[in-house]
Amino acid sequence: MASDHPASRVQRVRHELRRRDLTVLRVDTPTPGFRRITFTGAELAGFTSASFDDHVKLFLDAADGGEPVRRDYTPRQYDAAAGTLAIEFALHGDGPAAHWATQATPGQRATIGGPRGSFIIPTDFDWHLLAGDETALPAVARRLEELPAGTRAFAVLHVAEAADRRALPSAASVQVQWVDSGAALVEAVRALDLPGGEGFAWGAGEAGTMAALRRVLVDERGLDRQAVRVSAYWKQGATAHHEHIET
């Protein structure tokens, strides 16, 4: 069991902010509602992603010829030796990034920026809670792959379509609960039988749902605010929304 206060063990690391022009190498469909696009290119040299919580900006040409569309995505897997970066796209809604991912083919060009920095959560907490919707699934999957044997983790995931509820490989001991709505996600976390010891809770998804989740974790369940990291990856009725939720 870790003895230091969580705030003293979480690391915030800054990275050189660069844009990189890349090429689509491969397009895979892990489940019907997702595309996994693998990029390559000489400009990937020096790319860094130190945390599953990281995000890069994807720049896409606007349909009206105006300013490029910008959307945030998790670096799902970076292979420095192979010179590849994989990003998974949740195909929810009809936005420009989902449309681009649906029609992407090998040889297409794309530009990414970042990550600007990393919020590094140690793996040696007594337990880890990961909660989110489809947009958080790539980050959750990456985190579970990174957790070592002997670690205990709980994942509560709002993924409405059964076909998109995939296996989540991990060396850790993982309890996964799938739910059908944001409200059900919050309720499931409220009812979750968490163990003793020092844990860390991470969540990402729709802004309103994540605000409610943070209130449950901090106000109702009594978790230390420094042991909770909740972010809005999108907001109902808004575009290009991404924020860390503090209250």
Name the predicted role of every residue range:
Residues 1-247:
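Extended, composition-driven regions rather than compact fold-specific motifs
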